[in-house]
Amino acid sequence: MRNLRAAAPASFLAPPAPPLLLPPSTPTPRGAFSAKASPAAAAAQAHGWCPSPRRVGRLRRRAGAASSSVASVEDAKKDVLVALSQIIDPDFGTDIVSCGFVKDLEISEALEEVSFRLELTTPACPIKDMFEEKANEVVAALPWVKKVNVTMSAQPARPAYAGELPEGLQKISNIIAVSSCKGGVGKSTVAVNLAYTLAGMGARVGIFDADVFGPSLPTMVSPENRLLVMNPESRSILPTEYLGVKMVSFGFAGQGRAIMRGPMVSGVINQLLTTTDWGELDYLVIDMPPGTGDIHLTLCQVAPLTAAVIVTTPQKLAFIDVAKGVRMFSKLKVPCVAVVENMCYFDADGKRFYPFGQGSGAQVVQQFGIPHLFDLPIRPTLSASGDTGIPEVVADPQGDVAKTFQNLGVCVVQQCAKIRQQVSTAVSYDRSIRAIRVKVPDSDEEFLLHPATVRRNDRSAQSVDEWTGEQKVQYGDIPEDIEPEEIRPMGNYAVSITWPDGFSQIAPYDQLEMLERLVDVPRATTAAVSS
């Protein structure tokens, strides 16, 4: 995985707040695990933080300074919650008690045994074992505790607006679109392997093949039941299943029409998606068809897409089409959280070759501010797995391709959790002072930008030649008094700004941080209005 920003910890488990979770003064190099280290400790150490004798000693000294007993159950519960509040979730930036993860806290009558449940945001948390180990450690350090019982669970699958959704979608927590406007770049390969990666991480997963004209799912997986069945009582479609993953495709509907007009196709997609009895799912992965047509609009109108994963190849033509897709998702208010560059390279004779060139995926990341980029090699087994009906991550779960998809799965899990917890827009326009207010995510910093400065620094192909870097839009082309008409967030990495001339600009947060800031702020003329 290539990350063009500082990498965030690959899980929902963060190094708890100082001083408890400070790493040792001489940390063990990454990958240099002790032979006696537990898998959870090894995973933590791989991320640069782990249980250390020094920290355990601090815990014991702290425990020795405290009372060896508590007066009541309520006092005991307070002690436990204070101890657990030392564990910080990196994505939400607060402790697990404030996040509401601690459930069913019970103290025995003898005030010696503690039981509680940690309810994570998703069962696919990549190092949930480390979370459990950390909770055991901090509670066991309390001087009056003799036994700790920790149970791990996940929040029930429920979208934010379940009551407003079709019945079939009301129990799905996250809907992920895997998309590329260009055909033949490997969307279906990425969608299927991502789905089985998430399932392998412990999530309940479904796949929806939204390509009516060329469904790929019946070829890429081989379920025993290859026909969709309708429940005669509820009139809902029962999805077929393979290795624990539910799936629906027009290819499983039997012999149907081969030629359909646009409205008919949209109706078929709507029916297949919304009348299917998906049950409770943590993630529904949608394999989007190529293009930016009626089907895409139908899907975004019917299903509340949580995020999109963009698939591309190194060729320039693929980049041009993918850029259209990213802008489509911007207008439909769907954040793009990762780019997968497929068929990127192959290794031979100890060397790495790039037969289709380099840079297309990186250009998408840089131009649109998408924080994560993943490279997939040209590999015969990856192609063959799509023909044999067994996904590559299932056939070779320890291989290099599976490791790349594991990193992609961690990214998707992490970004979806952040998106679902968003409570406010990070960027707004203050009409009273004619300035754009920017509050960077995960930071208390707020600053002001001149709207014309933001517009002049657009990185898109309309403003800058993506191959030569030549500026197309000149300084004088943008009036000083230009004002944005609308500002809306694109996940955790960028905002989409609509200008009076109809231009839609995608402005990554890291770009906004580097722009010249307003110092002499004009006096307010009217009441401030947030976009």
Swiss-Prot record:
Residues 1-62 form a transit peptide. The keyword Nucleotide-binding applies. GO terms for molecular function: 4 iron, 4 sulfur cluster binding; ATP binding; ATP-dependent FeS chaperone activity; metal ion binding. InterPro entries: FSCA_dom_sf (IPR034904), GBBH-like_N (IPR010376), GBBH-like_N_sf (IPR038492), MIP18-like (IPR002744), Mrp-like_CS (IPR000808), Mrp/NBP35_ATP-bd (IPR019591), NUBPL-like (IPR044304), P-loop_NTPase (IPR027417). The keyword Methyltransferase does not apply. ATP binds at C181, K182, G183, G184, V185, G186, K187, S188. GO terms for cellular component: chloroplast stroma. Its cofactor is [4Fe-4S] cluster. It is found in: Plastid, Chloroplast stroma. Pfam families: FeS_assembly_P (PF01883), GBBH-like_N (PF06155), ParA (PF10609). Residues 17-37 are annotated as: Disordered. Residues 28-37 have a biased composition (Low complexity). Residues 17-27 have a biased composition (Pro residues). Binds 1 [4Fe-4S] cluster. GO terms for biological process: iron-sulfur cluster assembly. Keywords: ATP-binding, Chloroplast, Iron, Iron-sulfur, Metal-binding, Nucleotide-binding, Plastid, Transit peptide. CDD domains: Mrp_NBP35. Belongs to the Mrp/NBP35 ATP-binding proteins family. Required for photosystem I (PSI) biosynthesis and assembly. May serve as a chloroplast scaffold protein that specifically assembles iron-sulfur (4Fe-4S) clusters and transfers them to the chloroplast PSI and ferredoxin-thioredoxin (FTR) complexes. Probably not required for assembly or stability of plastidic 2Fe-2S clusters. This is Fe-S cluster assembly factor HCF101, chloroplastic. It comes from Oryza sativa subsp. japonica (Rice).
